[in-house]
Regions:
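Core segments of transmembrane alpha-helices
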Residues: 34, 76-91
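Short alpha-helical packing/oligomerization segments
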Residues: 91-111
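Interfacial loop-to-transmembrane junctions
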Residues: 115-142
Length: 158
């Protein structure tokens, strides 16, 4: 059996997954692109701060009023949150979890992370909760939902 069919498409065993989970994979790409964008924003503001900068060190006196602080926190918050989500999405794809559910959860997470990012850049407040907290919470609840529902799916498949 050839892996290239007569329409010049590559046929790889299990490649149906890529079609079935295309929306999920695109959502993951958006999430990872958002995080890369956040890294570039944080680098730009960090290197542009007055008084110079030291690689990887944020001045301890900086707070919410500093875009250097907020861009750094936005990026690190995304890094903290992507690890469990990304792992669960990969497990979902490999275990043939519902493609439509996984796509919906991934896009909810992607959109809430983008809104959270924009609000974190724009809102200068020490108050908690703030409007950005709502979108952090939606992303966190999305993680919890996927953790529980995927766990049930994996247990049922035993």
């Amino acid at each position: 059996m050839s892996i290239i069919n007569n329409t010049y498409q590559i046929n790889i065993p299990g490649s149906y997954m890529f079609e079935e989970y295309q929306s999920t994979l695109l959502g993951l790409w958006v999430i990872l692109t958002t995080i890369l964008f956040q890294a570039m924003v944080a680098i730009r503001f960090h290197r542009g701060q007055k008084g110079g900068y030291k690689v990887g060190i944020i001045k301890p006196e900086l707070g919410q009023s500093s875009i250097v602080f907020r861009s750094h926190r936005t990026f690190h918050n995304s890094l903290e949150n992507i690890i469990p989500f990304f792992g669960m999405v990969v497990l979902g794809v490999l275990s043939e979890y519902s493609a439509s559910k996984l796509a919906l959860v991934t896009w909810i997470y992607a959109i809430t992370r983008i809104i959270h990012m924009v609000l974190y850049y724009k809102i200068v407040t020490e108050k908690n909760p703030s409007p950005r907290s709502l979108f952090w919470a939606i992303g966190f609840i999305t993680n919890i939902y996927l953790l529980v529902d995927l766990g049930i799916h994996l247990i049922i498949k035993l």
